[in-house]
């Protein structure tokens, strides 16, 4: 952890990863990273069913070859019940540190369990679907409700571009949507700072905005199965995570567009991916801000991410329900949604932006 000072000169903790390793084949460097961090025994690898063979067992074998005691456990859902199950397993096995190996959900479960036990955590993503792979936040579901929970940032991030490039491209495109959503998140944060004197960090906001803009400007170069695309997106996700750590909150990367996504999770029969929904939410919220929503839509189209309800696989009526509900998701967080949209206003926004037809 690093110590910094806020605008009033008060101390606050800033958590940042010590090591970030990105590249082809870097999963084979996991034991070197652990050795560098003085993590030398009693590791718990938390992975998923599908990612166990892709990366989980590679990490386990690598650490065991280095003489470490390593256990591997399969995480089946991103719920508090699952976090508690993993936590109990870790206590019983004397775990000294965690490695979350897999998707964002698996990483969030490992991150929270490690935070609860106050032990180090290393993030080893097999997909780049959202900024949870590096942030100090975790998204946990309770039924149809998704909650963003404060956690410790990973001590290290090991992102193997070859593995991530082989994941379904839809996941990478979703990660782009999550990054581009910084555009409206920062606008919401600025608005809250002006109207409600919410603490605002110019550094965090600038980093989050720049990260999103670089991705928008490079949208036509992000393609399936290209490691160069993966490197760009992973670096952007890392930057977003760092922006949140600097801010001490998720404000630089989570605003009204994320509230819309969480509202969709509640009302839709089959929600889309988090980053996909945030991307569409960014189009809608940029319209409300009076910004260039078409630029957002065009960038998402170039990347191959959804820009309409149909492309999300969600009925128009759920888009409208989510828009009306969005302001209630985090009522303490002021955004462009204010006290909420009327059903008529929601329909105008959705039709003007062509999110619904």
Swiss-Prot record:
Keyword terms, alphabetized: Cytoplasm, Lipid biosynthesis, Lipid metabolism, Metal-binding, NAD, NADP, Oxidoreductase, Phospholipid biosynthesis, Phospholipid metabolism, Zinc
GO CC annotation: cytoplasm
Transmembrane annotation, as ranges: none
Location(s), subcellular: Cytoplasm
Pathway given in the UniProt record: Membrane lipid metabolism; glycerophospholipid metabolism
Binding sites annotated in the UniProt record for NAD(+): 104-108, 126-129, 135
Residues that hold Zn(2+) according to the record: 178, 258, 274
Cofactor(s) required, per the database record: Zn(2+)
Reactions catalysed according to its record: sn-glycerol 1-phosphate + NAD(+) = dihydroxyacetone phosphate + NADH + H(+); sn-glycerol 1-phosphate + NADP(+) = dihydroxyacetone phosphate + NADPH + H(+)
Protein family: Belongs to the glycerol-1-phosphate dehydrogenase family.
Cited HAMAP family: G1P_dehydrogenase_A
Protein name: Glycerol-1-phosphate dehydrogenase [NAD(P)+]
Organism expressing this protein natively: Methanococcoides burtonii (strain DSM 6242 / NBRC 107633 / OCM 468 / ACE-M)
């Amino acid at each position: 952890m690093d110590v910094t000072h806020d605008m009033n000169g008060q101390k606050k903790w800033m958590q940042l990863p010590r090591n970030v390793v990105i590249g082809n084949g870097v999963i084979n460097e996991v034991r070197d990273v652990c050795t560098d961090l003085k993590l030398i025994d009693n590791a718990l690898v938390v992975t998923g069913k599908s990612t166990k063979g892709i990366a989980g067992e590679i990490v386990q074998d690598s650490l065991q070859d280095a003489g470490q005691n390593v256990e591997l456990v399969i995480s089946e859902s991103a719920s508090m019940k699952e976090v508690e199950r993993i936590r109990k397993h870790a206590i019983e096995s004397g775990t000294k540190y965690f490695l979350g190996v897999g998707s964002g959900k698996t990483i969030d479960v490992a991150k929270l369990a490690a935070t609860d036990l106050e032990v180090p955590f290393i993030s080893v993503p097999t997909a780049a679907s959202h900024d949870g792979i590096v942030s100090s936040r975790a998204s946990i579901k309770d039924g149809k409700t998704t909650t963003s929970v404060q956690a410790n940032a990973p001590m290290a991030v090991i992102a193997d571009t070859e593995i991530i490039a082989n994941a379904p491209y839809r996941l990478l495109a979703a990660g782009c949507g999550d990054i581009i959503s910084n555009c409206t998140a920062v606008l919401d944060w600025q608005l809250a700072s002006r109207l409600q004197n919410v603490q605002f960090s110019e550094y965090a906001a600038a980093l989050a905005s720049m990260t999103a803009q670089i991705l928008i400007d490079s949208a036509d170069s992000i393609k399936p199965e290209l490691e160069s695309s993966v490197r760009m997106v992973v670096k952007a996700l890392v930057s977003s995570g760092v922006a949140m750590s600097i801010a001490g909150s998720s404000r630089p990367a989570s605003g009204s567009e994320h509230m819309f996504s969480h509202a969709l999770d509640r009302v839709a029969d089959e929600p889309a991916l988090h980053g996909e929904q945030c991307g569409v939410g960014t189009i809608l919220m940029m319209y409300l801000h009076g910004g260039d929503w078409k630029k957002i839509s065009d960038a998402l189209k170039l990347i191959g991410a959804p820009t309409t309800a149909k492309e999300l696989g969600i009925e128009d009526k759920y888009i409208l329900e989510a828009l009306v509900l969005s302001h209630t998701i985090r009522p303490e967080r002021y955004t462009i949604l204010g006290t909420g949209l009327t059903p008529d206003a929601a329909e105008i926004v959705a039709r003007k932006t062509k999110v619904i037809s």
